[in-house]
Amino acid sequence: MHRLQVVLGHLAGRSESSSALQAAPCSAGFPQASASDVVVVHGRRTPIGRAGRGGFKDTTPDELLSAVLTAVLQDVKLKPECLGDISVGNVLQPGAGAAMARIAQFLSGIPETVPLSAVNRQCSSGLQAVANIAGGIRNGSYDIGMACGVESMTLSERGNPGNISSRLLENEKARDCLIPMGITSENVAERFGISRQKQDAFALASQQKAASAQSKGCFRAEIVPVTTTVLDDKGDRKTITVSQDEGVRPSTTMEGLAKLKPAFKDGGSTTAGNSSQVSDGAAAVLLARRSKAEELGLPILGVLRSYAVVGVPPDIMGIGPAYAIPAALQKAGLTVNDIDIFEINEAFASQALYCVEKLGIPAEKVNPLGGAIALGHPLGCTGARQVVTLLNELKRRGRRAYGVVSMCIGTGMGAAAVFEYPGN
């Protein structure tokens, strides 16, 4: 109860907490490299497919996961048996996809001697996999491991919470855990005054940024083209290669967005156009202790500086990043001003806007290549995908810099991680 009162107290007065974040003194440059640093060696992702009608609609999640596992290992010429552990984030498969992920491991030529676990922390599952592998490296269990995320929203059942006690009816917070995500978006919009026009403008910007990035080839280095098969309308099977994200709509306009009806509530402001897309995809991130990476001659794409996950009220779960980001920044000894790029998952424009405004983040630092509204949101994949996108964009820019990955989490949480790009 005390925790809830603290969070609600933060929500009541945004200007004070926002200014406090901005007024904090800047960090004293970059930390010195340490042999014990947890570093990101490499990362790849599949294109993100449109669930139900895209190029991956007939592709099983183990095949998507195998594509990125294989690509990462081949890219850096790492022997599969060198992996100390694999962690795979997944939301919709039974048991967080534990069997599916182990199958993908074998399809990728990774031997049975390499262990694997599956993790489900809803929309942060891919980032939680990164944190889990980093934790194993830090505690000395192993020196190198693979963190992944995968989701086929086409082939998975959604909306079934499973076996739950009827006692939840007696507890408001327990009941709130079952509120549909679209209604939590409406709650955020209503409670904090996020207008339909602002949400649509945010969605338009996401589409425009993603379209520009796609046309310039900004995603080319991170995407693994996937050759697969699809069934056409006649039931015939044909082979295709999916090489770019399918949800990007360069023709999006404010006028078009304004015509869309509310998707979750009569008179509401959350629409299909200002919400994340239902998607299929996978991503993999190779992490190591710095000393092991150097010993094996592996590249260093980034350094994990901190990770934080926090709880917030379930009925406004989308505010999670507004509290997870400050927690992660504090652990890293940084402020909002020290960060070059914030990759904040766009579950809904309402909640993403709230978080950006709450923290006083300049718009140009937020999702510079577009976010989930344009690219899509394959639930278990997203956190790992964001890490890959963030570090590749920092690499493209070339200079030493910090970036943040963050997302809201269904049932009322937020997660965030701070990464350092070491510079070219």
Curated annotation (Swiss-Prot):
It is found in: Peroxisome. Its main location: other. Residues 1-26 are annotated as: PTS2-type peroxisomal targeting signal. Keywords: Acetylation, Acyltransferase, Fatty acid metabolism, Lipid metabolism, Peroxisome, Transferase, Transit peptide. Its EC number is 2.3.1.155, 2.3.1.16, 2.3.1.9. It catalyses: an acyl-CoA + acetyl-CoA = a 3-oxoacyl-CoA + CoA; 2 acetyl-CoA = acetoacetyl-CoA + CoA; hexanoyl-CoA + acetyl-CoA = 3-oxooctanoyl-CoA + CoA; tetradecanoyl-CoA + acetyl-CoA = 3-oxohexadecanoyl-CoA + CoA. Induction: Peroxisomal thiolase is markedly induced (at the level of transcription) by various hypolipidemic compounds in parallel with the other two enzymes of the peroxisomal beta-oxidation system. The modification N6-acetyllysine is found at residues 173, 234. The active site is at 123 (acyl-thioester intermediate), 408 (proton donor/acceptor). CDD domains: thiolase. Pathway: Lipid metabolism; peroxisomal fatty acid beta-oxidation. PANTHER family: 3-KETOACYL-COA THIOLASE B, PEROXISOMAL (PTHR43853:SF17), 3-KETOACYL-COA THIOLASE, PEROXISOMAL (PTHR43853). There exist at least 2 rat liver peroxisomal 3-ketoacyl-CoA thiolases. Responsible for the thiolytic cleavage of straight chain 3-keto fatty acyl-CoAs (3-oxoacyl-CoAs). Plays an important role in fatty acid peroxisomal beta-oxidation. Catalyzes the cleavage of short, medium, long, and very long straight chain 3-oxoacyl-CoAs. Medium chain straight 3-oxoacyl-CoAs are preferred substrates. This is 3-ketoacyl-CoA thiolase B, peroxisomal. It comes from Rattus norvegicus. The gene is Acaa1b.
